[in-house]
Amino acid sequence: MTVTYEVPLSYTINVSLSALPQGLAEFNTNSIAIFSNEPAGFSDSYRAYLTPSSVATDFGSNSLTYKMANALFKPVPNFRTGGGNLYIFPFDGTNATAGNFTTIDLKESNITAFQSLENGSLSITIDGKTSVVSGLNFTSVKTLEDIANVIRSKNLDVNISVDSNKIVFTSRSAGASSSVEINTISKADLIDISSSTYLDASNGIATAGTDAKGTTLADAVAQAIQQVYFGGVLTTQVVGDDTRLANATAIQPLDCVYYDSLQSLNAISKIGADIKSAGLGKTRTLAYSKDNHKVAIATYASVASSVNYSGSNTANTMNLKTLTGILGDSGLNDTYLLSAQSNGVDIYANTGGISVVYSNDNNGYTDDINNQLWLKKALEVAGFNYLRQTNTKIPQTEEGMTGLKNAYAQVCEQAIRNGVVGAGTWNGSIPFGDAEKFTEAIEQKGYYIYSIPIAQQPQTEREQRKAPVVQIALKFSGAIHFSDVIVTIQR
């Protein structure tokens, strides 16, 4: 057989196959990390969880870690709706303790004396703030628990419990500044229940609170976020106000949101005010005076992290949201309500038979802070992937800049779809770009993107292969929280 030479097809047509480089996946700002100072059933630095039952296996079903994790999965929607994962990081920070005042053993004679008292008074100093309550009617009491209930009815910012034959008054704050004292009332027209006939407070014992020790939450978060990304931070640790403020300050520069609870309602005007005045908007506080305040803030964080930013009209507000499984705070009053509003602390109250969150402005509302975090991470990924996903290069030309700005514009369009951004009117002076185009873009779309022409870029920046700075103006759609209605009627 004669073999005839054939010229290979590749001599004429040479085909090479290449794939575009893989880009970064989007950061999931709805993922939540619990930093647990309870014993863990594993030695890893952290574990990921898709169900609360696995948390019970590792920490025990009676642990606070499990109760907080379980609370994350309860609301509908919750952080999983937003695609979030749960990570739990063990760390060795100890709990701060609360100050308390414990009476001596009270006898039957003390209870008998209370039974004849219709208008008793009590002066108590809690964390340095003195309150005097009167009108304490003990005529129906039979036990120390009954006596405690009468005092509880005055809604003092203190936990009152019975331990054998003693009544214990425990501060709802913790740390070295946490304290409780029972005072003597000097007014002759008031019947002082601190006297030896009743509580015999002069022989009671006041114990000051102590600060947390060991690894701080701030240090634990800084180390953990290098291992896996999460957008929300919770902790089982109990801390004092100084440590809480230090944690908030350290977490503020990080790309995450710190959710914390305040059991003391008086803390609204103290640490709540400090956090707001320091500009620490990434710390979101919920004042809730019940013992399960840590579970309440976990439920709150889950609802706040439930936005699926890939969806349509999915953006939310925490205002008037119900926290599944959490009762409204019966310790609230008008003073605390107004204090929470002015100091940017959220509360959970009863209105018309339902329990809802009242969300307040701490350098932005909770949804503002979460939306800003998502927006930042989405823009980072969009810009990186545009530069990354080419087998050649993005030229330093107007064409290259148009492509880069288009990548950022896709995030802005997504923000319109999910309801974070909306068309509106820009209030104030035009900050950059062409004033007419700026105004038109904000009114028609809700965002405006601008960069100076390549020809105007400083040569030093061009030599460093930097793009001209891209400036983006966004009009957040906000949320309606209040409404005034005026009705004019003619007869």
Which residues does each predicted region cover?
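A glycine- and small-residue-enriched flexible loop/hinge signal that marks low-structured segments
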Residues: S153, D163, A222-T392, L404, ...
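Short, surface-exposed charged micro-motifs
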Residues: D157-N159, D346, Q471
